[in-house]
Amino acid sequence: MKKELILKALKLRDMGFPSGDIAEELNISVKTALYLTLNGEELLKAGETPKEDSEKLDIFLEWDNVRASSRRLRNISKIICDMLSDVEFDGVVGISSGGVPLATLISDELDKNFSIYVPKKHVHTEKEKTTGFIGQNMSSIVGKDVIIVDDVMTSGNSVKETIKYLKGIANPKKVFVVMDKSGIDEIDGVRIEHLFRTGVVDIKK
């Protein structure tokens, strides 16, 4: 595990970020984020990450060189627009926070309604039970056919939550993610499309 990744996780932890937000920011699973925030100092002192069993293996994805550039993001959005050529829809819903820039560019390119879904992991409240919500232009997608956009899908939980919420007010037709780590092709009858997919290959000597 890279020292840089451990340092980033610890920095975000010290800034008050919960494990869910750290996982999204670093494109790792919540389980890995929790492991790093709890054991990061010891890992740095040891000089290397101890060998872990296969259940703790995770893949770290970094695409800062793309998402930091509006021009490069627009090029990615054009690829997704091309993949949407056979899909009839009225609106684009970006999952906060990683999916919002892409959803904005896609809706602009195709002249579609735009909205944001804020997952419950980003809702900071003292209530035990909380839900996500539509954060912008809800009226523009009610009763409409929509697509869902996110940057990275790790466990699929945020996408599943978004689909469940939207099915109560709209008709989610497809989900588009840049990078898929989950290997999931469909959630609740909604197809998941990806630009790139990662996986772990167990090579035995």
From Swiss-Prot:
Keywords: DNA-binding, Transcription, Transcription regulation
Matches recorded under CDD domains: PRTases_typeI
Source superkingdom: Archaea
PROSITE patterns xref list: PUR_PYR_PR_TRANSFER (PS00103)
GO biological process, one term: regulation of gene expression
GO molecular function: DNA binding; orotate phosphoribosyltransferase activity
InterPro entries: GfcR-like, PRibTrfase_dom, PRTase-like
Entry similarity comment: Belongs to the purine/pyrimidine phosphoribosyltransferase family. GfcR subfamily.
PANTHER family according to UniProt: OROTATE PHOSPHORIBOSYLTRANSFERASE, PYRE-LIKE PROTEIN
Domain characteristics, as noted in the entry: Contains an N-terminal DNA-binding winged helix-turn-helix domain and a C-terminal regulatory domain (or effector binding domain) resembling phosphoribosyltransferase (PRT) domain.
Name of the featured protein: Transcriptional regulator GfcR
Gene name of the encoded protein: gfcR
